[in-house]
């Protein structure tokens, strides 16, 4: 360990640092951490320690001083000897307080929501009373300010909160370490229990949280939704359709494809004794495996589909005449759709193609000829393992043709450039049918070209279509599927809120367990924001308020607390403050 003197030109002062050279096992290189210990003054220079080391140098016993600080003190004495000037303690000014202002707005609003959903009780069951108060206080801070937790001390010391005091960055780190996976999953189990029999449909989606640094094992390269050239962690979120109340959230490895995350999330929910009433998902989760998984375990769902699979194209082709009928027209907003619905059986069967070969398991989608949906009859060499009834809704919109075609051509062109750049690359399964890749005998390069017959067929028959598959009897017609699916923007708003208003665009911790704990605090903060947004949306007075305006009105609620026997005085609320409390159905509890 040694002293480093650095002249700061802007400050016009020489600052002193205690530096050392350490070997980092994880980075496999030497690092040079520095600690500021003071500065030099006068001529000849005299060392003036900062507040921390001034107190340590004044303490002659140093019984409670940490070993690392003792080494720094020894280096300071070795370097400067007697040329050390300790600061004089500032005189303590005694003040006699008659009254003080207590800003209780966040306590009134967030406390009311906490009581409504018993969030404090659930947190206490999962983490104990003290940690529950700390988690609530940090969640209130996030919901109010949306800044990094390390900056919470000023807010916690200014506003009423469950802890009653500020929480240092070291205490926040210890809290994240204590929370643990068992406590986090216990919280989700108790929270999900409140929404067991609501009969509401559930929205499920993923987002990306970028990360730069080391220590997060779950961070990997993958499709980044924010277009950041950084490793990422995927974040799965489940929320209710009617109010978008978040129910469950969990980080996943950043390299896992969207399709494969669904079964992992449902396995988590099954272990927590929760089964969604009806899952609503976008096309990113559509696959034969996922649909078979959900049907086999009796999950109800509404799944948007890509139109690139052969089985869905057959259904589109069969329903073409039905969609040409004027009676198939559906008006939704400014768009016009033409719809058809096919009753199907999702069939899993064993099929033997040759003698002395083991039967192969296959999945097929059988379009029922009967309106009631007859079952599939096994053919020669087939054995039906299971079959589940479902409905496929197909909608065609002329307004979507242009945008879908442009996206399709852009995707084809990107794949074409990739194949030209890498002579060993193969087309993806999704786009394989639209390319011809051949290498002629003795040729140096392979020939990559478009299969224009199939490209033209896609343009003429399949652009402008959106498709859904469901086994929920309450979504019996295509108009119902379109109406239900249009509410998916709720979950997109949740993600935008978490990233832009709750400091979730970057991971700011350095271990997987701390990340999961940090995301739980984020999840609790989102409960408050979602409750405020949904209830204020239905209020004529509050509907046009921005998030900053709402937070400003809430933080402006205060009371004057007198010392001694005098009662507190609660100043009159403004019209906006009264409107917010009325819309939230929260009484003024000052």
Could you describe each region identified by the protein language model?
Residues 1-215, 236-249, 253-255, 263, ...:
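Dynamic "connector" segments at or just before major functional cores
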Residues 25, 159-165, 182, 195-198, ...:
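Secondary-structure transition/capping motifs at alpha-helix termini
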Residues 26-27, 149-153, 163-164, 211-214, ...:
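Short helix/loop capping segments that flank catalytic or ligand/cofactor-binding pockets
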Residues 190-191, 259-276:
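Short, basic/hydrophobic alpha-helical segments
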Residues 231, 248-251, 298-484, 552-590:
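An anionic, glycine-rich sequence signature occurring as long contiguous blocks
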Residues 280-289, 307-310, 513-515:
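Acidic, metal-coordinating catalytic cores used for nucleic-acid/nucleotide bond scission
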Residues 481-508:
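Short amphipathic alpha-helical "interface-anchor" segments enriched in bulky aromatics
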Residues 511-532:
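Basic, amphipathic alpha-helical segments enriched in Lys/Arg and hydrophobic/aromatic residues
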């Amino acid at each position: 360990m040694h002293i480093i003197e650095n002249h700061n030109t802007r400050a016009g002062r020489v600052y002193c640092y205690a530096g050392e050279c350490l070997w980092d096992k994880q980075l496999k290189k030497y690092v040079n951490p520095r600690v500021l210990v003071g500065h030099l003054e006068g001529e000849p220079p005299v060392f003036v320690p900062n507040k921390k080391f001034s107190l340590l140098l004044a303490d002659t016993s140093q019984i409670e001083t940490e070993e690392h600080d003792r080494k720094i003190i020894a280096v300071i004495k070795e370097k400067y000897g007697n040329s050390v000037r300790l600061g004089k303690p500032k005189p303590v000014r005694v003040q006699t307080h008659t009254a003080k202002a207590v800003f209780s707005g966040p306590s009134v609003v967030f406390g009311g929501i906490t009581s409504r959903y018993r969030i404090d009780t659930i947190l206490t069951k999962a983490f104990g009373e003290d940690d529950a108060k700390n988690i609530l206080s940090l969640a209130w801070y996030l919901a109010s300010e949306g800044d990094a937790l390390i900056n919470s001390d000023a807010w916690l010391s200014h506003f009423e909160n469950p802890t009653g005091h500020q929480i240092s960055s070291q205490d926040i780190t210890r809290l994240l370490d204590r929370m643990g996976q068992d406590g986090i999953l216990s919280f989700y189990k108790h929270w999900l229990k409140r929404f067991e029999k609501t009969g509401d449909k559930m929205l499920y989606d993923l987002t990306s949280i970028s990360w730069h640094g080391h220590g997060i094992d779950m961070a990997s390269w993958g499709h980044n939704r924010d277009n950041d050239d950084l490793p990422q962690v995927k974040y799965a979120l489940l929320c209710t359709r009617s109010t978008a109340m978040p129910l469950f959230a969990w980080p996943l490895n950043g390299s896992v494809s969207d399709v494969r995350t669904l079964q992992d999330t449902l396995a988590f929910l099954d272990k927590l004794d929760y089964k969604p009433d009806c899952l609503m998902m976008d096309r990113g989760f559509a696959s034969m495996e996922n649909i078979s998984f959900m049907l086999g375990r009796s999950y109800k769902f509404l799944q948007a589909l890509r139109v690139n699979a052969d089985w869905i194209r057959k259904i589109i082709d069969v329903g073409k005449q039905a969609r040409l009928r004027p009676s198939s027209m559906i008006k939704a907003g400014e768009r016009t759709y033409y719809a058809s619905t096919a009753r199907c059986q999702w069939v899993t069967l064993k099929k033997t193609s040759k003698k002395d070969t083991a039967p192969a398991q296959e999945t097929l989608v059988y379009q029922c000829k009967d309106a009631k949906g007859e079952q599939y009859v096994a053919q020669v060499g087939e054995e039906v393992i299971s079959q589940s009834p479902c409905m496929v809704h197909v909608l065609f919109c002329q307004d979507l043709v242009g945008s879908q075609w442009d996206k399709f051509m852009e995707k084809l062109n990107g794949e074409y450039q990739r194949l030209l750049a890498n002579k060993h690359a193969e087309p993806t399964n999704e786009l394989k049918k639209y390319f011809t890749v051949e290498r002629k005998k003795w040729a140096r390069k392979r020939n990559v070209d478009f299969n224009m017959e199939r490209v033209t067929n896609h343009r003429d028959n399949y652009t402008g279509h959106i498709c859904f598959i469901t086994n929920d009897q309450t979504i019996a017609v295509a108009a119902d599927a379109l109406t239900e699916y249009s509410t998916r923007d709720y979950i997109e708003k949740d993600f935008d809120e978490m990233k832009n208003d709750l400091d979730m665009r970057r991971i700011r911790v350095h271990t997987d367990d701390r990340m999961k704990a940090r995301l739980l605090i984020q999840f609790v903060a989102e409960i408050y924001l979602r409750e405020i947004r949904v209830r204020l949306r239905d209020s004529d007075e509050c509907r046009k308020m921005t998030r900053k305006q709402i937070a400003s009105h809430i933080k402006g609620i205060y009371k004057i607390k007198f010392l001694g026997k005098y009662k507190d005085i609660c100043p009159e609320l403004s019209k906006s403050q009264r409107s917010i409390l009325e819309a939230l159905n929260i009484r003024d509890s000052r």
